[in-house]
Amino acid sequence: NYEYLRSKIKPETKFLAVVKAYAYGSDAQAIALHLQDLGVDYFAVAYANEGVHLREGGITVPILVLHPQKAHFKVLIENNLEPSIYSQSILSDFILTAQERGVKEYPIHLKFNTGLNRLGFSAEELPDISKLIHHQDAVKVIAILSHLAATEDNNETAFTTLQLKRFDAICKEADATFKIKLLKHVLNTSGIINYPHAQYDMVRSGIGLYGYGNHPNVDSHLIPVATLKTIIAQKHNIPAGESVGYNRKYTSNSETITATLPLGHADGIGREYGQGKTFVSISGQLAPIIGNVCMDMIMIDVTNIKCSEGDEVII
């Protein structure tokens, strides 16, 4: 997946891999180490403790913290993590912490809101940011970023183009303000595919690295990196008229063979997946989840599937 996405950008464009939330629910250290070996230039995490985990696992390339919090500024600095600063209060607090730690020109990224309306400075705040930056030497702005709202949606091309126009204007003003070459990054996975002209100096990819590109044409080039599997714990022959599971939400119309699988709510399979709404796969055949999903068990209908206790099941 990395090689495919890498092939879509210019050789000189840096690649940032997003490994927040335990690398999207997998293994952040293992994923990051592999990507570091492949040549990834940067990593991004949501919180400082995730960055510390990567450093402890042997990651040496720069790590961007997308949601830096005042309580963790010292840990962030101690582990050479780069904060994405998105408000004047966060900027002021981080400068103060950096001064207290006695550091000079600590690298920071400035995040601007161009339309997602989640986190970020407004363009109008740039003069105030400049004053804060130029009256100290504890931190140094090295990058400008923003986040696009709908790069995967072809119906939102006009809005994405507007966001890119806003970002471009901010970048030009920032270059003039700080008088240095700033690293600029705005594209996400779908942006890499649909807006290649806006690569700037670096692109960011999260979901694409794990095998999903938000569009069938992209997904066909990607491979999901994880599969949830279990085994059949027990099979039952259920007579017609018998119920299965809590609240008797399934009643057999005829003699039915069921299989119980040892996973459920605790593994992220909510009740909305039960009562025949979704399926699991056994030897390439689909079996519906019947009844209510339990905390650590689900029941499936295997009446027409040849299978045995201990057989592998793909969720």
Task: Show where each model-derived region lies.
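Positively charged, low-complexity intrinsically disordered leader regions
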Residues: N1-R6, K10
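Secondary-structure boundary/capping motif
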Residues: R6, T60, P107, E255-T256, ...
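Active-site-proximal beta-alpha core segment in soluble small-molecule metabolic enzymes
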Residues: P11-L183
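Active-site anion/phosphate-binding pocket segments in diverse small-molecule metabolic enzymes
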Residues: L33, N49-E50, P68-A71, V75, ...
